[in-house]
Design a protein with these regions (language model features):
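Accessory carbohydrate-binding/adhesion or oligomerization-edge regions at the termini
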Residues: 1-43, 122, 472, 476-479, ...
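Accessory beta-strand-rich segments of carbohydrate-active enzymes
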Residues: 3-16, 38, 48-49, 53-160, ...
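Active-site-adjacent substrate/metal-binding segments within catalytic domains
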Residues: 39-64, 68-77, 81-88, 94-97, ...
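Beta-strand-rich binding/interaction modules
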Residues: 88, 172-204, 561-583, 674-678, ...
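Extended acidic/polar, glycine-enriched regions
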Residues: 112-116, 181-260
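Short flexible loop/turn segments that cap and initiate beta-strands
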Residues: 186-189, 223-227, 560, 568, ...
Length: 795
């Protein structure tokens, strides 16, 4: 058994030419590329979706040693978008019609042993293909290329094709195997290794699953994602005194856990879980789908650790095994679904969709994080015969998990186990999600909200303060109401990050600004809605995000706007200068009472100041403060109650105006300094200061500064932010940042990038060499900044 990574040494041709499959390929301009690869890098926005739609080709020459005689040579592609035909030495060997699943090609019969061989791939990423997700309009780009890793395996003629383990929380397990080749007389050996290193060995026959019970298991859960390792060996017993021979072995990670969906919600290992999830597209700026494993894993980190989500939906297709691996390790539940978007095609299209379902299940079913299969094309109309087949195919291959399918209409046919509903009903008032009983045709089955939020109310990072706040409160309202409504298992917000799209969608610049993060995964204000729901275990876990910059000139008429704080602290203290104003606690009976940590509205900017500076008694100060805060809220329009208070306190309008100018402020008033303190366990653990900007600094953060070149090229994700002297984002800074590198990395995308909403980013790819690298960043009006990286090469 030999394994080789095959991600270097490829040649790319932007148009497919039959000469690519021939032994000699002269006259073609071929570009050396490394995998993962995209057929066309696109600009950040205003891209042309036709640019990545092309019929192109890849070629790789290799030597096949004579020692491979009598062996089986298997070539595996992690994913090729979207229609791939593989040739070896001129022979057409394999065709694959899904851009989101892996496939394996047996090269054995076509090889020239002891000689040079030529492998060629015909890659078709045109959207007129009669395969999912194509056939209708699509609200995302689908890109093209060999965008996941490639590997070569040399095996015996008899080998293990697949291993699947069912493992329940109680410790019961069943191990299924599938083999290829002559296996008469062969046996199986299965070894389960715990995280602590203890081992249990079981033996079995090929015709039956290996069953058993492992005592004292630690179930996989969101809080404790315990992973076990299973190694299965295919053994040919020795004869005539010869020892047994291991023909093949396969290792998978898995977890002991039990998933149950009922009318009351989701139960994991018998404990109810309220899903607080997000939808994720696997696309990135410039590169589309073609990013290495490290960035796939980084997205899982953002979702679980930064946003505090416990679930993710891989909209609208199966995603990278590296992403699923990270979800397994982090305890992040995954709802993965068959490729497609609102369209169901003809019988040939459906046949490919069924095959996609089978491949999705077989390739993802050992991941304990996967708890739900999407057996329906997102948003598609009813098709009873077709969706009976998808559900049957999935349950046949994996009887342990329920199925769902994202519906966009009420009371559609429910052939799945769970009714998943894209609920975009909220318009800013009233209930934020529809009543479960009015949507699902069968209230005895499970129910969840598969999408909500960003599509209904997109927000650009550079939108004004009020717009960004409305999006954040929109997310908070639906999150709250999905928790409050009995029988709703939870929700998946739309979506993690902004993404490139077709001309029929988005904001006219080929971007859907639906994300709680931008394309570079910089957080918007709405990200704080999710992040603030985390349960803090240390001061560093405390989130404190203030919605307002407290800049009156940014607001219509200079009238102060709403100010909300998104925090998981116990309370928030407000100071004006050095003077304490008031302390605010979450409203456990208000609009967001169902949330673990409701956002806090800062509605008192006067507080105790009147007692200190106006000499008022406490009761009078409370009434006057109420008048001033109401005037702030209502654009200087006193209510009848405020007028009555003024009369009872013998306050004239000029008296009120004087105090308003002094304690609230108007356009042109001396700018005040506000300090917000997050209080946890009785002490201030995090502070935000709002005051006029005195200096601008360019912040450069490399999220993964240690890179490993191998088995593919690696990539660093870099975030850029313009911040003030207090570390606050400057949302209207749009300066250009000049980027320059030293060392063995290269910039993906332009070397000069603008900040959008005060934020930006870039990617740094390894070049096949080890060493230290430096990223130099220069922006007008700020000091230059640098970031350092370490690049290692895997042997």
């Amino acid at each position: 058994m030999e394994h080789y990574d095959w991600n270097d040494g490829w040649l790319f041709c932007p148009t497919f030419d039959p000469a690519l499959v021939r032994p000699e390929c002269t006259g073609l301009e071929l570009e050396p590329v490394r995998i993962p690869h995209t057929v066309k890098a696109l600009p950040y926005n205003y891209c042309n979706e036709n640019d990545h739609q092309r019929l192109c080709g890849y070629r790789r020459e290799f030597f096949a040693p004579a020692e491979w005689a009598g062996r089986t040579v298997l070539l595996t592609f992690g994913a090729i978008a979207h229609d791939a035909t593989v040739f070896c030495n001129g022979r057409r060997l394999f065709h694959h019609g899904c851009g989101y699943t892996a496939f394996t090609v047996d090269l054995t019969s076509a090889l020239h042993l002891g000689k040079k061989n030529v492998l060629a791939v015909r890659c078709d990423s045109r959207e007129n293909l009669n395969i999912p997700p194509f056939g209708g309009s699509i609200d995302y780009l689908t890109y093209g290329g060999i965008y996941r890793g490639v590997s070569l395996d040399i095996k015996e003629p008899a080998y293990l094709r697949d291993v699947f383990v069912e493992a329940r929380a109680e410790g019961d397990f069943r191990i299924y195997t599938a083999t290829v080749g002559e296996t008469v007389g062969c046996t199986l050996q299965a070894e389960i290794r715990s995280p602590a290193g203890s081992r249990a060995v079981y033996r079995g026959e090929l015709a039956l699953p290996i069953t058993g019970t492992l005592n004292g298991v630690h179930p996989w859960s969101i809080e404790h994602p315990t992973l076990y390792t299973l190694t299965v060996k295919l053994i040919r017993p020795g004869t005539s005194g010869l020892p047994d021979r291991v023909l093949d072995e396969k290792t998978v990670r898995f977890g002991f856990r039990t998933v149950q969906f009922v009318a009351g919600g989701l139960y994991l290992n018998g404990q109810r879980v309220v899903l607080r999830g997000i939808n994720r597209h696997q696309s990135y700026a410039y590169q589309g789908y073609a990013m290495p494993d490290s960035l796939q894993r980084l997205d899982a980190q953002f979702i679980k650790k930064d946003l505090g989500c416990n679930a993710v939906r891989t909209s609208h297709y199966p995603q990278s095994p590296a992403f699923l691996d990270a979800c397994d390790e982090l305890g992040l539940l995954v709802f993965t679904e068959m490729p497609g978007w609102q369209h169901v095609g003809d019988e040939a299209w459906k046949a490919q969709a069924l095959q996609n379902c089978r491949e999705m299940v077989c390739q993802c079913r050992n991941h304990p994080s996967v708890f739900l299969w999407g057996a329906r094309v997102n948003g598609s109309p009813d098709d009873e015969a077709f969706y009976k087949r998808t559900n049957e195919a999935i349950h046949r291959l994996d009887p342990t998990r329920p199925t769902a399918g994202a519906h966009i209409r009420r009371r559609e046919q429910l052939l799945e186990d769970v009714y998943a509903y894209n609920d975009y009903s909220y318009r800013g008032r009233g209930p934020a999600c529809e009543a479960r009983a009015s949507v699902t045709p069968d209230t005895r089955k499970g129910y969840l909200i598969s999408e909500f939020g960003g599509q209904n109310f997109p927000a650009k990072p550079f939108d004004d303060e009020a717009h960004r706040l409305v999006q954040a409160l929109h997310f908070a309202a639906v999150l709250n109401d999905s928790i409050a409504q009995q029988g709703v298992a939870g929700s998946f917000g739309w979506c993690l990050a902004d993404y490139n799209t077709h001309r029929e969608f988005g904001s006219g610049d080929r971007i859907c600004y639906h994300g709680v993060m931008d394309l570079f995964r910089n957080p918007k204000l709405s990200a704080a809605v999710y992040a603030s729901q985390k349960t803090p275990r240390a001061p560093s876990d405390i989130v404190l995000e203030v919605s307002s910059a407290m800049a009156l000139g940014d607001l219509p008429g200079g009238v102060p706007g709403a100010c909300w704080v998104f925090t998981n602290a116990e309370s928030v203290r407000l100071y004006r200068g050095n003077d304490f104003v008031a302390e605010f606690a979450p409203d456990r009976r208000g609009r967001f009472a169902a949330l673990p940590h409701p956002p806090i509205e800062i509605n008192d900017f006067v507080g105790s100041l009147l007692e200190k500076y106006e000499g008022m008694d406490h009761a009078s100060a409370l009434q006057v403060a109420a008048i001033l805060n109401e005037l702030r809220r209502d654009a200087m329009e006193p209510s009848p109650l405020s007028r009555a208070r003024m009369l009872s306190l013998r306050l004239g309008w000029n008296d009120v105006l004087r105090m308003y100018y002094k304690y609230i402020g108007v356009l042109g008033s001396p700018a005040a300094e506000y300090r917000f303190e997050a209080v946890w366990h009785g002490r201030a653990v995090r502070t935000v200061v709002r005051e006029p900007v005195q200096s601008v600094r360019l912040e450069c953060v490399v999220h993964n500064p240690i890179l490993t070149d191998g088995p593919t090229w690696d990539c660093a994700a870099v975030s850029l932010r313009a911040i003030d002297q207090n570390g606050n984002l400057l949302p209207y800074c749009g300066e250009a940042v000049q980027l320059r590198t030293e060392g063995p990395v290269k910039i993906l995308g332009p070397a000069v990038v603008p900040l959008r909403g005060g934020m930006g980013g870039t990617y740094l790819a390894t070049t096949g060499e080890a060493g230290r690298a430096v990223l130099h960043c220069r922006m007008e009006g700020a000091l230059d900044t640098e970031a350092y990286l370490t690049i290692r090469c895997r042997e």
